[in-house]
Each structure stands twice: as C-alpha cells, then as structure tokens.
Amino acid sequence: MEEPPQEALAEPLKHESPAAPSSAGHTKGQEEDDQKNQAERKADNHTAHRIADQTALRVPSQAESSIFSQATNGVAEQNGHSTPGQAGRRASNPADVSDLRADDQVNQTPSEQTKGKASSQANNVQHEQSDGQVSGLTEERTAEQTERRLPTQAERRTSGQIDGRLAMPSDQRGSRQTDHRMAGQSERRASEQMDRRMSGEAERRTSEQITHRLSKLSERRPSVQIDSGSSVPSDQSPSVQIDSGSSVPSDQRPSVQIDRRMSGKVRRRSSEKTDYRLAGLADPGTSEQTDLRLYGLVDHKTSVKTHHQVYGQATELAEHQAIDQAHSNADQPPVDNAHYTESDQTDHLADRQANHKDQLSYYETRGQSEDRIFPQLGNSKEDKEADYRVQPCKFEDSQVDLNSKPSVEMETQNATTIPPYNPVDARFTSNFQAKDQALFPRLPSISSKLNYTSSQEKTQAIVTKSDEFSEIDQGKGYHIRNQTYRRFPSIVYEDPYQVSLQYMEKHHILQIFQQITENLVYEKPEDPLNFMLCQV
C-alpha cells in the first residue's frame, strides 16, 4: 500500500488543531485494538515457527531449499517497498520475515497515529489498509502452510509406500533365497543319505550273490578236476595240480574286481536314477554281468581241461617227442666253442649216425614184436591185404636226416630201382601220320604229341624197397644183421583223361568226326542224321 503524502496530512492538522483533544479517546481504543492485533500476530508467528521447525525436520534438504526459496520470493514480491537489508534477512530465515513485517507495521502505526490525529478519516483509512495487509499476510501464510503440509504429507505417504514396497520385495527375496537354500541343502542331504543307503544295499546284495556263485563253482571244479586227473599223463599232472592250486586265489581276485566294478556302476546309477528304480535294476544288471564273467571263466577252464584230456590220450607221441628232442639236442654241434676243429665235426657226425641207427633198430624190433603178436590174435586174409595197401607214412623231423649217409643211399637205391618210362607216343605217331596222309589228304594233320612229364610221374608204378641198414653197436656188441621192411606191391595210377585221349588217338575218332562234319556242311542235306550214318 502507498503511504499518504506528508504535506496533505500536515494541512488538515493545521486546520484541525483545535479539535485534537476530542480524538484522544479514539486513539486509546485504537491502541488497544492494535495491541490485540499484535498479540494475535505473535501467536500466529509462534505457530508458524513450530510448523516450520517440524517441516524442516521431516522434509529432506532439497525440499527445504525449494520451499525456503519460494517463501523468500513470495515475501519479496509482497513487500516491494522493504529495504534490501530487510529482504536479505527475510530470505535468510522465514521466521524473521514474519517478525520484520510485524515490526514494520507497528512502527508505521504510531507514525500514522501521530500524523493522523487531526483527521479521523485518514486514520480510519490507514487502519483499514493495515488490517487488509495483516489479513492478506495471514491468509497467505495459512495458504503457504497448507500447501507445505499437503506436499509434505504426500511426500511422506509416497516415501513410506515406496519404502514399504522396496522393503517388502527385498525381504521377500531374502526369505525366498534362504528358503530355497535351506530346502536345497535338506534335499541334498536326504538324497545323499538315500544314495548311500541304496548303494550299500546294492553292494551287499552283489557281494552275497557273487560269493554264493563262486562257492557253487568251487564245489563243481574239484569234481571235474578229479575226473580229468586220471586221463592226464604224468608229464602234465604237475601243471594240472598247479592250476588247481592257483584256482582259489584266481577266483578271489575276479570277485574283488567284480565287486569294485559293480559298486562303481551302482553308484553312478544311484546318482542318475531314483531310489526305487535302482532297487529294481541293480540286482538284475549286476547278476547278468557277474553271470557272463563267471561263465566265461568256467568255459575257459573247461576248455583247458578238455585240451589236457585230448593230449592225455596221446602219451606215446609225447614220449617220442621227448626222446627226439633229447637226440636233437645231443646232435647239435657245440657252436659256442671257439676251438671247434674238424676232428670234433667228424666225431659229431659219427654220433649222429649211431643215434640214427639206434632209432632204426628200435622201430625194427617194435615191428617184429607186432608181427609176432598179430598172428597170435588170428588175423584174417582181409587184414593181411589191408596191411599190404598203401598207407600214409608220417615222419617227424628228428627221424629224417637229409645229411645222413643212409638217407642218401636210400635215395640212390630208389632212383636205380625205378624203371624208365617209355611213352606211347612213339608207337602212334609214325602209324598215325601215314594213315592220315593216305585216308584224309584234305584234312589238316592233328598233332598227337603231348607232354607226358606229369603223366610219367602219375602212371609210374612206384616200387618201394626197404634199404638194408646195418646196425652196429660199439659198446654193447650187437650183431650186424640185414633186415628188410615190408615190401609193398606196385601201384599203377592211370589218369582217365589220358586213357580217353589214348583211345581216341588209337581209333582216329577226331579225324572221323572232322570228315563227317566237313561233308555235312558242304552238302547240307535235309536229313543230317541219316547222312551221318551213311558216312560211317
């Protein structure tokens, strides 16, 4: 509000100076009203201070700065006539703003009272103006307070809601995580305990089954070994005993290995599958695997036993092999000796010949004993004829010595006893060529010369004669005697292809058919069969 001009106030005071005592009573009442208004203002200021303090404590620093800046701006706009120092004070503290306003109004009222004692109208106007200012200020303060309270309450509610919402998800997440962790740990512990129990039960079952089956197999094996013990020769009996003696630890070792393998497999299955499936599948799977392995071991041992039985039946061959090995070891020259001379070589050859003669004498005496035994048993003519038949002879490496002198003599005697074979070509070639030229001059000559190198060997009658071996015993003084082995009759082997070829060449069958076919093709008769018969 604008202040009234002092000159205008001075003029009515001059004119109304005699009426000043009459307005003294009016001033007293006005002062009382002013005091009441000041008391009300002070009460309003106190309430404003309290509300400001509460809002300063509750609202954040940013909200305080914005609110104080708005308050200072509003006060500066309303009190445009205030001094710069007062504006600075108001901006610094909102509580001081209200005090300054009240002081200004109080200072203005006495001056207005002293100046306007003469004119009641001017005083009434001033009081109305001051009342309007005070009422406007109070209304602005209440509006600002309500505006401040509303945003602060809204901020409190929103912040409380946000804090509650944020706190609730964080609490819920933490509780859920802890619940999940506790549940996972409890489930892991329970599953581990169940897996351990199931694996222990499966291992116990498999071990019991394996021990039971091994006990059955161990009961079966001694009986089989006792049965096969009689047929095994004396040379092989120690090996069989060693096998039977080592069967017990060998059975225990596979059982331990099977237990370890099966326990590992059962543990893997228990970790992958449920407990109920493991209880149902562990027994059949382990039993099948143990059955296959145990049966494989049993089959291997039975095959070895049958192998021993087969070799047990051939005791004589084993004895002969042992004798031959001994002789061959004796026959081997001492190569390792550095001073091996020619005299040693001659001695070695003489020893070999003596050993060979000893072997021949052994087989001769054995053949004579067989010849003596068979007539006593009553051999028939069929048996004798069967004896004269050619039978395959099997000589061992130790019995045949190509470097020995008797073998060389045998070969020379056989070569001399075999007569030379004269082929039949010489008989047919001359006659056949003359007849061909006389009978069939137009036909080309067919060569009848064949290679009979292979047929000579096949058609040759092999006559085996036993060589006469002299037996000389230097140490024991055996008599020298000549004895022949069995004489086999001559066997003539004829090839059917060679026989048919000789027949066709003998009767000129090829030339006849060649002439007939030539005439048939040349004349081309309607009845070729009759034509061919007429030709013959």
Curated annotation (Swiss-Prot):
Main location, first listed in the record: nucleus
Stretches with biased composition (Low complexity): 1-11, 226-242
Compositional bias annotation for Polar residues: 62-85, 105-136, 243-255
Summary of the tissues where the protein is detected: Testis-specific.
Keyword annotations from UniProtKB, A to Z: Cell projection, Cilium, Flagellum, Nucleus
Ranges for region Disordered: 1-287, 328-348
Source organism, top-level taxon: Eukaryota
Gene Ontology terms: cellular component: nucleus; sperm flagellum
Biased segments, Basic and acidic residues type: 35-52, 138-158, 173-222, 339-348
Locations listed in the record: Nucleus; Cell projection, Cilium, Flagellum
Stored Pfam families: Tex55
InterPro entries membership: Tex55 (IPR040760), TEX55_DD (IPR048377)
PANTHER family on file: TESTIS-SPECIFIC EXPRESSED PROTEIN 55
Name of this protein: Testis-specific expressed protein 55
Gene that specifies this protein: TEX55
